[in-house]
Amino acid sequence: MLAIISPAKTLDWESAVPNFTFSQPHLTAYSEKLINICRQLSPAQISSLMSISDKLAGLNVARFEQWQIEHNEQNSRAAIYAFKGDVYTGLEVETLSRDDIQFAQQHLRVLSGLYGVLRPLDLMQPYRLEMGTKLANEKGKDLYAFWGNIITDALQQAIEQQGDKILVNLASDEYYKSIQENQLGVKIIKPVFLDNKGGKYKVISFYAKKARGLMCRYIIQHRVTDIEQLKEFDLGGYQFNPSSSTQTEFVFKRDVIK
């Protein structure tokens, strides 16, 4: 079983990182091509392209300039410790054990606009490049065209190593679109998290993102390798709802926010 999550816009380069043997990202030759394209853009162009402030554009221009193809502990940080957002609030990586992280290294992947696919302990440098960015490149008008089947192939290799051909999609639609689903040839399970609001169950973005992190944490801590085990997820007050679920979409509902 392999689970996928999205990265986060906000980065954490401050908190302590445990001493691990870190791994190298596999697709940096492609990352370098994207960096070289981004280096040709002015701060104003970056601001417009990414819909960010002039200040953030300046920061990211500097990041593109400073990026190096060599990744080491001086210029990089392990991916699982580098992102800080709603999903990662649910994941609470700082409370996971060393054995948990080693399990995650085999069973979790972070999709990335710049790096394609990252393992938890893969080193990465600070960047902002969302998968939905319309960055023109040699392959087309956006990052979906750029990555083509590269991300799909990388995930396929990782899934084959698991031996069970199961992918748990905990990524956002923006990132999941980078995968060519029909070429994967695996069973894909999509957990959906609904909260009771005014008597109706709805996807509430903030809570759903955090729940995806909670599910990721559950998979790691319980060493989940079987689809049926996913249904036992109960963190944050969510419960599996069989009547609303299908064979590929597992619905979890919550009445009281915890």
Swiss-Prot record:
GO cellular component: cytosol
Positions of transmembrane segments: none
Gene Ontology terms: biological process: response to hydroperoxide
InterPro entries for the chain: YaaA (IPR005583)
Family (UniProt): Belongs to the UPF0246 family.
PANTHER family linked: PEROXIDE STRESS RESISTANCE PROTEIN YAAA, PEROXIDE STRESS RESPONSE PROTEIN YAAA
UniProt protein name: UPF0246 protein HS_0482
Species for this entry: Histophilus somni (strain 129Pt) (Haemophilus somnus)
